Amino acid sequence: MIKKAGVEMDLIQKIKRIEQYVVENFEELDMDDPEEGYWEEYQEIPGASQKEIEAFEKKFSIKLPKDFKELYSYKNGSKYFSILPSTIHDVEMSFSLMSLEQIVKTKQYFQNRDALLTEFPDFFTEEEIEKMRDSRIKPYLFHKQWIPFAEYCDSCFLMLDFDPDKEGKEGQILCYIHDPDEVIYAAAGLSEFVDEIIQTID
């Protein structure tokens, strides 16, 4: 566990540290000034109730990771405040946390079906598919068992993976990147993903 001033930080303390960093470094992160209103709006966002989290799990027939439930008990989404400034495969993306309600709506049109990469021969050659191969991720472009929970520019998403490949782990974080479309491994889980952000900013 990462320490700050000799004291171990839990997940929510780390999130609060990231909040502080984003507010202080929005220009460097190429973001709008949080003082324009969306920081105040973010501060007022409540956490999801246990009942809401359980209903979400039931809807998708999943068991959410403990750290994911902990984060959503703190904040049920972040609206326009980019709470997860990340670098994935050398690409900088500042993700906003989607609310449980947003996730449900998004799943109606995105990651709402199973489609392998091989089903898109006009977009991916056999060589490209082989190059994208990752033994932790099943070779889909769209998969019902992927749950998008954070978004960047309405086109890139962080997703929880509930159907990993043989060397993957349930609950691992994947990133769907648009144009060109690809799905890449981001972290072993939410806690690890947040830890990587903390290590970058501290």
How does the language model describe each region?
Residues 149-150, 162-163, 189-190:
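Catalytic-core loop-and-flanking beta/alpha module that positions acidic residues
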Residues 155-158, 180-187:
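Short, surface-exposed beta-strand/loop "edge" segments at domain boundaries and coil↔beta transitions
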Residues 9, 89, 160-164, 180, ...:
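Intrinsic-disorder/low-complexity regions
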Residues 2-151:
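A surface-exposed partner-binding patch
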Residues 151, 177-179:
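Short acidic, glycine-rich loop/turn motifs
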Residues 184-202:
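Long, compositionally biased interface segments
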Residues 156-169, 174-177:
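Low-complexity, glycine/alanine/valine/leucine- and proline-rich hydrophobic stretches
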